[in-house]
Amino acid sequence: MKVRASVKKICDNCRLIRRRKRIMVVCSNPKHKQRQG
């Protein structure tokens, strides 16, 4: 899980979702997991 100020889709499988008022990226590739810090 990467914590970043700006979250972006890295590949086509990445999905932007909102969870508990946080923007997150979920993907089939675990390296692409991000959340906004």
From Swiss-Prot:
It comes from the Eukaryota. One of its GO terms (biological process) is translation. InterPro entries: Ribosomal_bL36, Ribosomal_bL36_sp. Its main location: plastid. GO terms for cellular component: chloroplast; ribonucleoprotein complex; ribosome. It is found in: Plastid, Chloroplast. GO terms for molecular function: structural constituent of ribosome. The keyword Nucleotide-binding does not apply. Transmembrane segments: none annotated. Keywords: Chloroplast, Plastid, Ribonucleoprotein, Ribosomal protein. It holds the Pfam family Ribosomal_L36. Belongs to the bacterial ribosomal protein bL36 family. NCBIfam families: rpmJ_bact. This is Large ribosomal subunit protein bL36c. The lineage of its organism: Eukaryota, Viridiplantae, Streptophyta, Embryophyta, Bryophyta.
